[in-house]
Amino acid sequence: VKLLFYFAAAMLFLSAARLWAADPSEDLNSLDRHFARELEILAIRCDTLGLTEQAKITREWQTRRTKGRTLLFLPPVVRGNDLPKEASDLVQKWHVKFHALRQEQASGLTKLAVSLASAKEADPATAYRLLHEALREDPDNRAARNALGHRRNATDNAWEAYSPPPTISAGKTPHPKTGWQQGKYWRVDSKHWRIATNQSGAAGVELAKKLEDFHWLWKQTFFEFWSSRAELEQGITNQRPLPEPGIQLNVLLFRTRDEYVKYLSSQPNIGLTQGFYSDAQQTSIFFVGDETVQPTWFHEAAHQLFQQWRGTPQGVGEKQNFWMVEGAAMHVESLQNHGSHWTVGGWQADRLQIPRYRVLNGDKGLPLQQLVALGRDQVQSSADIRKIYSQSAATAHFLFDHESPMYRSAGGTLLREIYRQNDQRTSLAQLTGASFEELDAGYLKSLQVTDDDLLTTPGLARLRNLALGRTQVTAKGLAALTVCSELRWLELSGLPVDDAAFANFKNCTKLDQLFLDGTQLTDKSLPLIATFTNLEELDLSNTKLTDEAVPALSKLRKLKTLHVTGSGITAAGVQKLKAAILKLEIQN
């Protein structure tokens, strides 16, 4: 019986292998569809054979391409056969087939990348990223490794790590900038970064590793800024690394925020920041914090890479296009680690929520022809600086998240010209081949969100801020938000949200701002609203809630502002709320 079982298993795996006979066309969608189909066939075989864990791994393996988000990959380490020695014969057969499917996908991705790099309508940035994606599928893929200029270690013939381990040394003299005493701080050197910190050597190493990863992700995100089609073609042909400046970038990491603020006390509003890049010192300056500081670290490191890659003199963006200087740095704040890959961009990016809220509530911001004309001083002295920064972030996302390679390329090329100080006020229109009126229309359209966006985007559980009001989202899409337990700010104004749809937000107990203007909520949602005890602002305008809401709302002791205009809450109900919650401001 056992022999028959193994024979049947072997036949199942072989039958799955035969379906690989027809090579997919060298098109990314075709490759993905073929890969998905083969993985599902393999997963079904695993189900049949009782290999539950292997079926799960197989089904969850493929990365998902979603609208507006770019996939990024760090070069993996080749580990060989990672199966435990005691793995059963069936599991070993699964592993062989699983690895073979990934090798085929890697081969297809590499061929497509080479084609894209040299085609008449070349897309070198996508080609560069696909070479990295190929290594995710097959870390030992020689064609992709060679195309990226990777080298083998002379000692054991293994592929060299993309970033050697950082080295640590104690400060042997007083630090020339911070005044840290000899032996009271550490220097950490990695391939691209030189870090000094008074926290610990381990903290410096941890930061160095994050910044080395970021360096690799930054290159994939802004390929047109630092390289070109010709250099990529030549690199693929000659199997050599693409040219980069051989420099280390300086970073200071302070033990506490207070030390950071004291060191930068001459900078305006420095107490409001979580990181700073100093042009004058050519140094990024950070303090030790939790995971919420990482987007700022990436933001400031991006400024540093843009500024120092070619030794650009100070004064970038002084005459025009300052929006892109800040917009590109804010774009990388959307980087997310998904384990075997990263993403950047997408409708859910934190920096897109406020501009979406403003635009869909009638404040369209500046026409792009006016935005591109603003220089650094004009922006930083403007009374509307926050709105301009917000629009700058959204406009950068509009370019870098665009479905058209021409628009994505235009973003990187515009950055290159800005930092070469060759840009003009007309550069954006020229590079995209669109009029400013067409760009305005495209920008506004890019801020919309649909049910499909919500239902196909992974990682929603991480969201902290979300503006969906007056988008095309319905109850169908809202069902995807049951995982959003980290939300602090949620805006649903004008959506067809009834009591049943609102129940999807039962896990959002950390909310401090909630906007429900114009929704279809009734008093039935009161028990749920009463659980949001951290709320400081609540908008119930133009809903069907009545004075029955008063007892439940009175439990929200942290509430500072309540909007009830157009609701069924009467003047008497308002007075009861004011009596229950001291200092509550009610907009009616």
PLM regions and their residue ranges:
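Juxtacatalytic substrate-recognition/specificity segment
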Residues: 184-315, 319-321, 332, 423-427, ...
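Acidic/His/Gly-enriched intrinsically disordered linker/tail segments
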Residues: 181, 270-285, 292-296, 315-448
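TPR repeat positional signature
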Residues: 38-39, 108-109, 113, 145, ...
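Beta/coil-rich, acidic/histidine-enriched accessory regions frequently appended to metallopeptidases
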Residues: 417-493, 509-515
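Pro/Ala/Gly-rich low-complexity, hydrophilic intrinsically disordered segments
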Residues: 66-110, 124-187, 438-467
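Concave beta-strand-loop units of leucine-rich repeat
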Residues: 467-477, 486-504, 510-548, 557-569, ...
